[in-house]
């Protein structure tokens, strides 16, 4: 996901993460920080282990491009209020990515009710091989993603001056 939005990131653009994130939802955003000048902002949990929603709201600004948070913590088991996270993010024009690696296998998930732009999960949590996963995205959100690798069946036409990509 971070690679998919990288071309839209300008120095000073913000990515908001929670302190509950698995490193797989931290390291890619650090790449954007290192390579493109993105600013990572961190939101803590409250005394119950829930995402501190007041701190989340305070962390958001008109420079926030992405709120990337766990839907269910792999350490605490906390389920975040994804619909409220989306509402707050929308108020500043930010997109929402939910890490569904835990929730996708432990609870019923309705991505439309959650109103997230993207929902990701890993294949090994559903007895698939390591290194694969699934991505849900709203059509308009997926259309904003840019390819970060090329080849094979993703290419429609290759010419000297341009490349046309197949529909996702």
Which residues does each PLM region occupy?
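Pyridoxal 5′-phosphate
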Residues: 1-168
